[in-house]
Amino acid sequence: MSAVNTPAGFTDFKVADISLAAWGRRETIIAESEMPALMGLRRKYLAEQPLKGAKILGCIHMTIQTAVLIETLVALGAEVRWSSCNIFSTQDQAAASIAAAGIPVFAWKGETEEEYEWCLEQTILKDGQPWDANMILDDGGDLTELLHKKYPAVLDRVHGVTEETTTGVHRLLDMLAKGELKVPAINVNDSVTKSKNDNKYGCRHSLSDAIKRGTDHLLSGKQALVIGYGDVGKGSAQSLRQEGMIVKVTEVDPICAMQACMDGFELVSPFIDGINDGTEASIDKALLGKIDLIVTTTGNVNVCDANMLKALKKRAVVCNIGHFDNEIDTAFMRKNWAWEEVKPQVHKIHRTGAGDFDPQNDDYLILLAEGRLVNLGNATGHPSRIMDGSFANQVLAQIFLFEQKFADLSAEKKAERLTVEVLPKKLDEEVALEMVRGFGGVVTKLTQQQADYIGVTVEGPFKPHAYRY
């Protein structure tokens, strides 16, 4: 697609500035050259049109890389309606380029909470009525939840949902356990080519990029505390170590904690003896009083709480690369401390009380992206080559679920298919192979003797389902 002028009469969109479309198109063309797996799938399945008839409701960060995803879905036959899953993550030139191509999109950087909810609604509605959608592509679960709570009738036609993130998968599993989930779901997050690339290697690239763009600080020689050591935490700790920071890690899972130790990070707790009893007395003030930067990476709630924020070193930087802004107790900060905007998505939080503040006061924290995703709020997120794996998985997951035609099954068959599953390993390997080829790499092929010896086929899959990469 190369259009940069909105089709005549097309008004089914809302973006910050449609005149940014040409800029967005130029960046999208560059991104395509850095997304070999996604573009490989576009070429491979173009003639087959596996998504012909698919009507996809999409809610994922409206970035340049997402523009390539959207246009791949459309090229393979789908119709889509789109919004962003985060109020700060939209790249306005990307949204404009999609609108200019005649694709409904409702997203702009710096939405209010009310505008965010409105954009979600517009994704679902066409001409004021629920669109006859039959697929969902989500990031974080807000769109899926809204459909279940407010538009359940739409779900009668939906074949499934593909979910991008850890947080969204947790919400899906919770809904499934409670008997609330009405459609099957593919857990894209736990595909190896998503979790290792996006969560780990992506954060390794984009965390330090965002912090430096937001603060213009030198990071080397300073102390950082990374909260959580899952894949996002691992990538984040590596990102800060690459900058020369002295990195400490806190964890609740003994296995992840062991990995942090084995990777050479000091494992600490912000709480004395690791016990948070909810009081200031339980805080390790000696530890937090030396921390220059704290990063939350967990997808859990209140992992950087009010008492921790009180104990942090003056002028410490606070940010989140998990998912929602409830990882950091921003509600406490809004209620009790004064906020001074330095520039968009960068605030000085004066710990001298609410209301007025002295601009020369030095007892403040620097909060990035208001506690939301720092890499998308203060920078442009993961690079195209990283998102290539994630979005190739999304395309394959959409094709996989669309072909299953869940909505057309009998009630008995639906009950059997109502699950939250990862993509088959063979498809994960398909994405990985395309990515390797994009790097110019050559994968060695097993001989028949070797394949027989380890009990696999020459074409794969090559590892058992439970293998941990």
UniProtKB/Swiss-Prot annotation:
Q: Which GO terms describe its cellular component?
A: cytosol
Its EC top class is hydrolase
Please, one GO biological process term?
S-adenosylmethionine cycle
Q: Where in the cell is it found?
A: Cytoplasm
* Record keywords: Cytoplasm, Hydrolase, NAD, One-carbon metabolism
- Which SUPFAM superfamilies would you find in this protein's record? Formate/glycerate dehydrogenase catalytic domain-like, NAD(P)-binding Rossmann-fold domains
Q: Which SMART domains match?
A: AdoHcyase (SM00996), AdoHcyase_NAD (SM00997)
Q: Give the residues the record marks as binding NAD(+).
A: 165-167, 199, 228-233, 251, 300, 321-323, 375
Q: Which InterPro entries match?
A: Adenosylhomocyst_ase-like_sf (IPR042172), Adenosylhomocysteinase-like (IPR000043), Ado_hCys_hydrolase_NAD-bd (IPR015878), NAD(P)-bd_dom_sf (IPR036291), S-Ado-L-homoCys_hydrolase_CS (IPR020082)
Q: In which pathway does it act?
A: Amino-acid biosynthesis; L-homocysteine biosynthesis; L-homocysteine from S-adenosyl-L-homocysteine: step 1/1
Provide a Gene Ontology MF annotation, just one: adenosylhomocysteinase activity
Q: How is the cofactor bound?
A: Binds 1 NAD(+) per subunit.
Catalyses which reaction(s): S-adenosyl-L-homocysteine + H2O = L-homocysteine + adenosine
Q: What is its EC number?
A: 3.13.2.1
Per the record, the domain of life is Bacteria
A Pfam family this chain is assigned to: AdoHcyase
> Which positions bind substrate?
T63, D139, E164, K194, D198
Which co-factor is required?
A: NAD(+)
Is this entry keyworded Zinc-finger?
no
Tell me which family the UniProt entry assigns to this protein. Belongs to the adenosylhomocysteinase family.
Alphabetized NCBIfam families for the sequence: ahcY, PRK05476.2-3
Instruction: State what this protein does.
Output: May play a key role in the regulation of the intracellular concentration of adenosylhomocysteine.
Q: What is this protein called?
A: Adenosylhomocysteinase
